[in-house]
C-alpha cells in the first residue's frame, strides 16, 4: 500500500497485491502467473509426486500464503540437532533450514511477474531442492556468486519478507546459501538460466562433493588468488615505472 505524495493518490501496490491479495484479484491482474509445489521424493513410474500445492480452491493464492504453506513441507525432513537457547528453549532452526528458505525467497523476489506466462515452481526431492522463477538474471553469474551486489526485480517484496523475518539483506542471500552448502561439504548450488524459456532455476543438491571436484575447486580458488596477486604486483610496477618517468622529466626541466 502506498500514497503518492505529489498527487495524493493512494492504493494497493502490485507488490502488495501479489503478496497479500485475494486469489481472484491476483488472477484478474496476473492471469499469467502460477504457483506450483511438488514433492517428488521417492516417486515411481506410476506416482509422479507425493504431495502438491497449486490452485485448487482450498487456499487464498497469494505469494505469502504460498511461501508459508510450502516452507514447512520443504524443511520437515531436515535434521534438527538437539540444542537449547539459554538452556531452556529448544532451537529447531538450523543454517540448512535458513538456506532453503533463502532459496525460496530469492525465487519470489527475482521473478518477473509481468511476463506473458510463468510458473513459480518449487520441487522437493529426497536429495535436492529446486526453485524456478520466470525471468532472466539481472546480473552476471560471476557477480551473483561473489555476492555484495543486488538487483532484486521486486525490492518491495524483498522488504516485506524481510520485515516479517524472511530473507537476508540485499546482496547477501545467495552467498549465505553457498556458505551453508560448503560447510556441509555438499555440491555447490547451481543457478541455471534458460534464455529460451526465460526462466531461472536454482538447484540445491544435498550431495557430498567428490574429492576430485573439491580439489579442483580449491585449485581454481588458488589460481584466482594468484592471478589477483600478480595483477596487483603489475599495477604497482606500472605505477613505479610511471613515477620514475615523471621524476626524469622533472629533473630535465621539461
Per-region residue spans from a language model:
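C-terminal regulatory or interaction extensions
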Residues: 1-254
Amino acid at each position: 500500500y502506498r500514497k503518492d505524495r505529489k498527487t495524493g493518490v493512494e492504493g494497493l501496490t502490485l507488490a502488495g497485491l501479489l503478496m497479500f491479495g485475494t486469489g481472484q484479484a491476483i488472477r484478474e491482474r496476473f492471469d499469467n502467473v502460477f504457483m506450483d509445489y511438488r514433492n517428488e521424493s521417492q516417486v515411481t513410474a506410476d506416482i509422479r509426486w507425493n504431495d502438491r500445492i497449486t490452485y485448487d480452491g482450498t487456499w487464498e493464492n497469494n505469494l505469502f500464503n504460498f511461501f508459508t504453506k510450502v516452507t514447512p513441507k520443504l524443511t520437515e525432513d531436515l535434521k534438527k540437532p538437539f540444542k537449547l537457547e539459554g538452556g531452556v528453549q529448544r532451537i529447531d532452526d538450523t543454517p540448512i533450514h535458513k538456506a532453503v528458505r533463502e532459496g525460496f525467497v530469492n525465487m519470489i523476489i527475482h521473478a518477473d511477474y509481468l511476463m506473458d506466462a510463468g510458473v513459480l515452481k518449487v520441487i522437493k526431492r529426497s536429495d535436492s531442492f529446486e526453485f524456478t522463477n520466470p525471468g532472466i538474471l539481472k546480473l552476471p553469474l560471476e557477480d551473483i556468486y561473489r555476492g555484495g551486489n543486488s538487483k532484486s526485480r521486486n525490492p518491495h517484496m524483498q522488504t516485506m519478507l524481510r520485515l516479517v523475518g524472511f530473507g537476508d539483506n540485499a546482496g547477501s542471500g545467495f552467498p549465505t546459501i553457498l556458505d551453508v552448502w560448503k560447510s556441509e561439504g555438499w555440491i555447490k548450488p547451481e543457478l541455471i538460466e534458460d534464455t529460451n524459456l526465460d526462466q531461472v532455476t536454482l538447484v540445491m543438491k544435498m550431495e557430498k562433493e567428490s574429492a576430485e571436484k573439491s580439489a579442483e575447486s580449491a585449485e581454481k580458488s588458488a589460481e584466482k588468488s594468484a592471478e589477483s596477486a600478480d595483477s596487483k604486483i603489475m599495477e604497482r610496477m606500472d605505477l613505479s615505472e610511471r613515477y620514475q618517468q615523471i621524476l626524469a622529466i622533472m629533473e630535465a626541466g621539461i
